[in-house]
Amino acid sequence: MIDINHVSFQYSGAEQENLQELVLHIKKGECVVLTGESGCGKTCVTRLINTLIPHFYEGEMSGTVSIDGVDTRTIQPHDLSDKIGSVFQNPRSQFFSLDTDSEIVFGMENKGMPYQMMLDRYQQTLRELHIEKLKGRNLFDLSGGQKQTIAFASVYALNPDIFVLDEPSSNLDPEAIQELRRLLLLIKAQGKTIIVSEHRLYFLNGIADRIVLMEHGKLKQSWAASDFALLSDEQVKMLGLRSYMPTRLELPEITPSRNDTPAVEVKDLAIGYEKGEPVAQHLNFRVYPGEIVGVVGKNGCGKSTLARTLCGLQKELRGEVLYKNSKVPSKRRIRKAYLVMQDPDYQLFTDSVYQELLLALSDQKDKDEKRIDDILDELNLTIYKERHPMSLSGGQKQRTAIGVAALRDAEVLIFDEPTSGLDYKNME
């Protein structure tokens, strides 16, 4: 069904090939998982399959890609819209509407589907994906995980033969990941062909037919899923991959340097958007210097809203936020706390990774640029230091934003889903 024959590709402006002599054949109804370290070429392969390469992303390409025997160079992406549906790593980049209902029906409207058929398919999508609670919502009010769910719904509504999913679990909570697993089992039972680019592997156990490991733009190794499942956790880690089995996190006992003055404290805090009901309220907690606190909960429960409120990007509805026992207005909190956002695209501004980190030192008297080299080395970004941040993979962007945070002299560092785009090696 999908045949990639000796394909090499280099993005326009890239210093080296992003794919090298790739050979990959995918049968109808097969579920193939692409995995490997950030920047290994997984997303590039998905763009070959959905024909964004060579029709949207410019570069030098050799070799051939064919879908059902048709060379993708001879057809446009819209010619395959009935056959292929894609969910991008960043769902925001594929939205065309302002609300969830319009987004789900957008593709069907563009196909000129009869109204009653479109309405039936829309209602079927809500029902089968269990997303009735997201009906009629403003897309800008959704959490990252909810946006990812709507992006999947808009593709599912079109009923394509091939689903191309680029890190579909990256913004999902454990419950939503299990729901994604249910959906993948559903479309696999319908005979759909599924290509998944992922770092998280455990939820694909029992769904995947093949695991394909990418490294530096090459297909390093391929396993039948049954053979991959026989690898020990240690062998999987040696490959730089996350576990194929669910793991239980054991937190070490850590005693923070506690004194009587909390670094940050919230009192009877209510957070949310001005025109709506609070996302969360009656929040009371303290965080002391040296303490690491994890905030967990379902998608849409208010984790990101709390993070934005603590650092002053969003104003609280009620209550108080105190830094070192002093109430701090939202506008002044920006100097107290630094947030690494769920979507790092929002906070990358310069023309290179090095300049991005240098910018973090701009308001500091002692601009020790050696710290930049140390951070680049620590985050495995040294070889990318002259690259434009927008040309990086999702995980590389995430690490760049984390590097900026490490160089800031903020009293409190807040990380919103910092591991979402990271492979095992860089997560460690």
Regions found by a protein language model. Name each.
Residues T35-E37, V296-K298:
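The feature captures the beta-strand-to-loop junction immediately N-terminal to the Walker
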Residues F163-D166, L413-D416:
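Catalytic Walker B motif of ABC-type/P-loop ATPase nucleotide-binding domains
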Residues N50, C311:
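Helix-to-loop junction immediately C-terminal to a conserved catalytic motif
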Residues N138-L142, Q146, H388-L392, Q396:
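Conserved ABC ATPase signature
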Residues T64-D79, E320-R333:
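ABC ATPase NBD Q-loop/coupling interface
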Residues Q116-L134, K367-Y384:
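Conserved ABC ATPase "signature" region
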